[in-house]
Curated annotation (Swiss-Prot):
Pfam families: WD40. Keywords: Phosphoprotein, Repeat, Ubl conjugation pathway, WD repeat. Signal peptide: none annotated. GO terms for biological process: exploration behavior; gene expression; memory; proteasome-mediated ubiquitin-dependent protein catabolic process; protein stabilization; protein ubiquitination; respiratory system process; response to oxidative stress. PROSITE patterns: WD_REPEATS_2, WD_REPEATS_REGION. Residues 1-40, 523-546 are annotated as: Disordered. It comes from the Eukaryota. Interacts with DDB1 and CUL4A. May function as a substrate receptor for CUL4-DDB1 E3 ubiquitin-protein ligase complex. The gene is DCAF11. GO terms for cellular component: Cul4-RING E3 ubiquitin ligase complex; nucleoplasm. It comes from Pongo abelii. Pathway: Protein modification; protein ubiquitination. Residues 1-19 have a biased composition (Low complexity). This is DDB1- and CUL4-associated factor 11.
Length: 546
């Protein structure tokens, strides 16, 4: 099957995995705003516009100017040195000291999380200081069946969040994607060097066992996903195709899934696989949702879903009947797979409240709740039973249209720091404290088995991993070591380990490590005392059920 690789692979100085979405209304800027925002090299901006076909060169200016512009084009497309994701290091995202929890307090998700973490019915003081009391009750046999319940285990594990760097792997170019498999046995990393690396994570290991050269890649691999049975993986790029490849076996068999787009320059920014592995969902730069049926081996749907790039797609739960999409129009839409039609592309509802484009969506897995990351520097928590009104959708669209800065190469304007809720915002909660610059930064719910999904965690343009408490909105952990933006983050489904993938070319595994040993913890015998101190284990009191 032939491939048509997009020549626009380098489009975008920060992350070309998006189309240029600066609207005419956003071109007008006041003198005060121009002084506040960081200056941008006009020659580099012009080079970007030329590459996107939005500006043409006419006669005049001399050959020297043409050569200069071409040199910029070559440096950005081939060497990718113009924007390396380090701009965000100078940006200190404002933290919301008093998150508004009024909507969340009245919603069932509060009860769900408290039940899943053993906090339901406990007073606030008991929730914070109940660890020794829990151990004492277990020793007295007062726990259910003599051991901690799943909720109590999750509450204990919250005391052992990853806090230390356990493993690092370095690449020659930017790391774009990194996710654990559903069972936690494999970690997959995708890099701008067009290589997909697989790591064996069984029995506490993190060892690379396979490297696969991706095919038909323009600029970089943009998204990856595992098949439900864990035997294959999929990846997308600036290409007409989504590719699927085997994980096990001696050879690498790449199968191209042709989406047959109408656009000449085409990219799939986000992919998801149905629970039965039959359908592959993709969101693309032409504003469309694509559905590819693997059994029929053809594209079955092309839905005009958003007014701009579709940056994020996700299935709501294991049924794969409800799905979510988010785009640069700042709207998150909810679709029913059973009623999706190309001739009548109507979602069942929409969620509005963001003021700029959505970069990622993660479902809680219960077909009710989801979170979205946005260029407005916030994460929002949604309940799909609370769709937005027309007023809310119009307010969100208007706010996105009036944005007059580009998050790929500019600093966040000070006016975007304001804590402002749009009319008709139907979100349950808004989380502030991380930066979203340069690229489509991801955020996710923490695992249900080990944490009861009591946390939300996100990458950050300042090179951090930021962990929020879902119910309070406060930041409970920041993991700092990267020198450029962290684009992707993934929490092990059963262990207290987080892997961050950064544009500094590094993959970092974070785990819990005890800060110091106390005298009571040390052995008393002389024979044991002469031995070296044991290395703290990375696992928490509850091991993986693998």
């Amino acid at each position: 099957m032939g491939s048509r690789n997009s020549s626009s692979a380098g489009s975008g100085s920060g992350d070309p995995s998006e189309g240029l979405t600066r609207r005419g209304a956003g071109l007008r800027r006041s003198e005060e705003e121009e002084e506040e925002d960081e200056d941008v090299d006009l020659a580099q901006v012009l080079a970007y516009l030329l590459r996107r076909g939005q500006v043409r060169l006419v006669q005049g200016g001399g050959a020297a100017n043409l050569q200069f512009i071409q040199a910029l084009l070559d440096s950005e497309e081939e060497n990718d040195r113009a924007w390396d994701g380090r701009l965000g290091d100078r940006y200190n995202p404002p933290v919301d000291a008093t998150p508004d929890t009024r909507e969340l307090e009245c919603n069932e998700i509060k009860t769900q999380v408290e039940l899943a973490t053993g906090q339901l019915g406990l007073r606030r003081a008991a929730q914070k200081h109940s660890f020794p009391r829990m151990l004492h009750q277990r020793e007295r046999g007062l726990c259910h069946r003599g051991s901690f319940s799943l909720g109590e285990q999750s509450r204990v594990i919250s005391h052992f969040l990853p806090n230390d760097l356990g493993f690092t792997d370095s690449y020659s170019q930017k790391a774009f994607c990194g996710i654990y498999s559903k069972d936690g046995q494999i970690f997959m990393s995708a890099c701008q060097d067009q290589t997909i690396r697989l790591y064996d994570c069984r029995y506490g290991r993190f060892r690379k066992f396979k490297s696969i050269k991706a095919r038909d890649v323009g600029w970089s691999v943009l998204d990856v996903a595992f098949t439900p049975d864990g035997s294959h993986f999929l990846y997308s790029s600036w290409s007409d195709y989504i590719h699927i490849c085997n994980i096990y076996g001696e050879g690498d068999t790449h199968t191209a899934l042709d989406l047959r787009p109408d656009e000449r320059r085409f990219a799939v920014f986000s992919i998801a696989v149905s629970s039965d592995g039959r359908e592959v969902l993709g969101g693309a730069n032409d504003g469309c949702l694509y559905v590819f049926d693997r059994e029929q081996n053809r594209r079955t749907l092309q839905i005009e879903s958003h007014e701009d790039d579709v940056n994020a797609v996700a299935f709501a739960d294991i049924s794969s009947q409800i799905l979510f999409s988010g785009g640069d129009d700042a709207i998150c839409k909810v679709w029913d797979r059973r009623t999706m039609r190309e001739d009548d592309p109507k979602p069942v509802g929409a969620l509005a409240g963001h003021q700029d484009g959505i970069t990622f969506i993660d479902s809680k897995g219960d077909a009710r709740y989801l979170i979205s990351n946005s260029k407005d520097q916030t994460i929002k928590l949604w309940d799909i039973r609370r769709f937005s009104s027309r007023e809310g959708m119009e307010a969100s669209r208007q706010a996105a249209t009036q944005q007059n800065w580009d998050y790929r190469w500019q600093q966040v304007p000070k006016k975007a720091w304001r804590k402002l809720k749009l009319p008709g915002d139907s979100s349950l909660m808004t989380y502030r404290g991380h930066g979203v610059l340069h690229t489509l930064i991801r955020c996710r719910f923490s695992p249900i088995h080990s944490t009861g999904q009591q946390f939300i965690y996100s990458g950050c343009s300042t090179g951090k991993v930021v962990v929020y408490d879902l119910l309070s909105g406060h930041i409970v952990k920041k993991l700092t070591n990267h020198k450029a933006c962290v684009r992707d983050v993934s929490w092990h489904p059963f262990e207290e380990k987080i892997v961050s993938s950064s544009w500094d070319g590094n993959l970092r595994l974070w785990q819990y490590r005890q800060a110091e040993y106390f005298q009571d913890d040390m052995p008393e015998s002389e024979e044991c005392a002469s031995a070296p101190a044991p290395v703290p284990r990375s696992s928490t009191p509850f091991s993986s059920p693998q």
